């Protein structure tokens, strides 16, 4: 087949969001687009203005939170930390952070614990580079990238091992090879999901630029709109955008015109099959940074609370959906719960996940070195627990 790459034109506002989504976080690096997927999918339900307002509010809260000079780390056991700020995207990786705040799991070590959500690369960059958050959820390649470029942080854990899915109008598609000769809609060209899709295709002797028609769009919202309005048959998306979108396509009045949509190929399952490994990828986790970095007692206490919170979320998806949706208006309780049930989540301390992280990073280095900052992180990157 001849090479076919289509780029869908979108309105100015959508193109501006796409430019933000693909903008360099630091020289040579980009921000993976899955972190904004849930907000984009929810906007499909008519919450676009609420999403913009919430994103702006979160960014304002994050930036204003570090106006004062950072205080010296408090010693857990003798004095409570005055304030801890936890931050994450509109995605599953933030669930345990929200549970920690909602249940007061760190009340014994901090006077005040707050959660804020980040939506744009500018917000994440400000929070990370200025050390405004104490614990920050982000994609695992991005934390390696920032660390390799000199930012002081430590990877605490990996909690997300599988959120990328092919969504298709046709049932029965089991592997990426089944998409040969078909069009695949892809948000965020050159970003992490795109890179992983290409990597997994090429490991199976599939040239995605020749054997498929790749149609790049500005955001997951655009991809889901194309599916729901029958203008596309297949798309690569991430949870909870997948779950929210599938729920929306089955609800009135959209269900009147929307086709049946299916979770098709799990990229995590493809990863395991192609590399003969466990079917999971260390996609996202939580880092420690800011004024409390180096407070080992606090780090250990946080890790205990994070594991407890993650276990609760996995055991109580419906209740977790309720508390997450209360704090992130763009998500629905049902969509959050569906995503928890569908995806692979397992809280693993960074040092214990190191071998899987390094294998993951090595594949990205060979594919697109800038995604991880050009090298493997050293020992100081991994929290030992």
What does each model-identified segment do?
Residues 291-367:
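Secondary-structure end/capping motifs
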Residues 11-12, 33-83:
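C-terminal segment of N-terminal export signals and the immediately downstream linker at the start
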Residues 100-103, 127, 145, 182, ...:
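Structured segments of extracytoplasmic/periplasmic soluble domains
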Residues 63-65, 69-217, 233-239, 256-265:
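Short, glycine-/small- and polar/acidic-enriched structural segments
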Residues 358, 362-385:
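Conserved C-terminal helix/tail region of periplasmic/extracytoplasmic solute-binding proteins
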Residues 141-142, 221-323:
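Pocket-lining segment of extracytoplasmic ligand-binding domains
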Residues 1-14, 24-29:
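N-terminal secretory signal peptides
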Residues 108-109, 271-276, 346-353:
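Short, solvent-exposed loop/beta-turn-alpha elements that line the ligand-binding surface or hinge
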């Amino acid at each position: 087949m001849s090479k076919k790459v289509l780029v869908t034109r979108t309105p100015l506002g959508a193109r501006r969001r796409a430019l933000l989504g693909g903008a360099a976080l630091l020289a040579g690096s980009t921000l993976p687009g899955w972190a904004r997927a849930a907000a984009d999918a929810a906007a499909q339900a008519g919450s676009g203005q609420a999403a913009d307002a919430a994103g702006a509010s979160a960014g304002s809260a994050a930036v204003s939170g570090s106006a004062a000079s950072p205080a010296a780390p408090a010693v857990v056991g003798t004095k409570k930390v005055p304030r801890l700020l936890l931050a994450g995207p509109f995605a599953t990786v933030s669930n345990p952070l929200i549970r920690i705040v909602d249940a007061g799991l760190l009340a014994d070590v901090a006077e005040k614990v707050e959660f804020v959500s980040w939506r744009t690369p500018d917000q994440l960059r400000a929070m990370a580079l200025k050390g405004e958050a104490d614990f920050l959820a982000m994609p695992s390649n991005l934390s390696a990238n920032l660390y390799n470029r000199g930012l002081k942080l430590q990877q605490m854990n990996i909690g997300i091992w599988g959120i990328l899915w092919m969504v298709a109008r046709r049932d029965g598609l089991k592997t990426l090879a089944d998409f040969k000769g078909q069009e695949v809609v892809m948000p965020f060209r050159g970003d992490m999901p795109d890179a992983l899709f290409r990597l997994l295709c090429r490991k199976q002797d599939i040239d995605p630029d020749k054997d498929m028609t790749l149609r790049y769009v500005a955001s997951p919202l655009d991809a889901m709109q194309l599916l729901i309005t029958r203008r596309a048959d297949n798309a690569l998306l991430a949870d909870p955008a997948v779950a929210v979108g599938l729920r929306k396509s089955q609800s009135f009045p959209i269900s009147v015109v929307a086709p049946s949509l299916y979770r098709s190929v799990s990229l995590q399952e493809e990863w395991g099959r192609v590399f003969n490994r466990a079917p999971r990828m260390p996609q996202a986790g939580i880092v420690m940074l800011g004024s409390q970095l180096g407070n080992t007692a606090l780090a250990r206490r946080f890790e205990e609370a994070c594991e407890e919170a993650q276990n609760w979320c996995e055991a109580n998806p419906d209740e977790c959906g309720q508390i997450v949706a209360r704090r992130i208006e763009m998500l629905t309780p049902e969509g959050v719960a569906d995503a928890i049930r569908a995806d692979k989540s397992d809280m693993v301390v960074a040092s214990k996940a190191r071998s899987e992280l390094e294998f993951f990073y090595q594949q990205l280095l060979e594919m697109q070195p800038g995604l991880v900052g050009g090298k493997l992180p050293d020992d100081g990157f991994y929290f030992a627990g």
